[in-house]
């Protein structure tokens, strides 16, 4: 494990990546994350369901992009800690030659990802870059060293847009990355919304605990990020309903998390 990242890990303040891992039943968290994670569950018991369902949504999205849409390059921004059904595993199971670039700057996520996130095929490429979500120009510049930006790319913002300080920042981050991609690329994202007052309260309390602020937004604000893009079938809606089938646990359960997938014309 890279010592430079181990030394940067803060165990005195909570991390959204580690709390998310706690909610998903993982082991990569510290006591401060467990305390905040358990307190969050008391405020919004649905958050554990959101954690599981968001991962299932990601898997369905990647299978669609690698399969029907024939995308062979993926840029997963704000990926967090490795867990089940990681993007490269799903993509390379469909298309062995898939290239996947993960973006995050959480030290523990970087430490674990570089140790665990390896291509599952000889033909595929899997890389993990240390970039700040708030620096889209840097993300594009570093991703260009691995991905071919003259060919379509599947760009993913899975449950991270709330880290944007303002609505304008959120749109700027997404648009800067998407503007660098060619026609035929896809934007895939989801986020929690203000439909649930419990979720809004959870985000407020998380910020008070010392974590990096997370700002829930309305459905309309999240949907507006897709303006100018063409939604694929299923459109924009609850992540539990997006191209879902009855075989998944908790299928069609209503939660206040919305997203979709859209093609860049």
What is the meaning of each model-derived region?
Residues 171-183:
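A short glycine-rich, Lys/Arg-flanked "PGG" loop and its adjoining helix->strand segment in the class I
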Residues 241-265:
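Core SAM-dependent methyltransferase catalytic element
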Residues 1-131, 136-149, 256-257:
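Rossmann-like AdoMet
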Residues 20, 230-243:
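Conserved S-adenosyl-L-methionine
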Residues 154-157, 180-192:
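Conserved beta-strand signature within the Rossmann-like core of class I S-adenosyl-L-methionine
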Residues 213-236:
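Short alpha-helix
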Residues 133-134, 143-171:
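A short SAM/SAH-binding and catalytic strip from SAM-dependent methyltransferases
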Residues 197-211:
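Short, glycine-/aromatic-enriched active-site segment of Class I SAM-dependent methyltransferases
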């Amino acid at each position: 494990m890279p010592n430079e990242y181990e030394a940067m890990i803060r165990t005195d303040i909570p991390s959204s990546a580690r709390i998310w891992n706690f909610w998903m039943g993982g082991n990569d968290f510290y006591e401060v994350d467990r305390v905040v994670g358990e307190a969050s569950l008391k405020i919004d018991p649905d958050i554990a369901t959101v954690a599981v369902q968001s991962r299932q949504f990601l898997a369905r999205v990647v299978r669609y992009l690698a399969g029907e849409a024939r995308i062979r390059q993926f840029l997963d921004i704000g990926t967090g800690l490795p867990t089940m059904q990681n993007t490269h595993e799903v993509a390379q199971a469909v298309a062995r030659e898939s290239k996947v670039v993960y973006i995050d700057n959480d030290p523990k996520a970087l430490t674990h990802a570089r140790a665990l996130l390896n291509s599952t095929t000889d033909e595929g490429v899997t890389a993990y870059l240390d970039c700040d979500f708030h620096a889209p120009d840097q993300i594009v510049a570093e991703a260009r060293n691995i991905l071919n930006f003259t060919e379509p790319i599947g760009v993913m913002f899975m449950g991270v847009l709330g880290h944007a300080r303002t609505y304008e920042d959120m749109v700027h981050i997404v648009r800067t990355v998407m503007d660098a991609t060619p026609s035929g690329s896809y934007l895939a994202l989801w986020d929690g919304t203000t439909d649930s007052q419990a979720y809004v309260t959870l985000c407020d309390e998380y910020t008070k605990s010392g974590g990096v602020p997370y700002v829930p937004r309305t459905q309309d604000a999240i949907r507006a990020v897709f303006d100018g893009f063409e939604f694929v079938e299923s459109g924009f809606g609850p992540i539990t309903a997006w191209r879902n089938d009855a075989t998944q646990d908790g299928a069609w359960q209503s939660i206040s998390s919305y997203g979709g997938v859209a093609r860049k014309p």
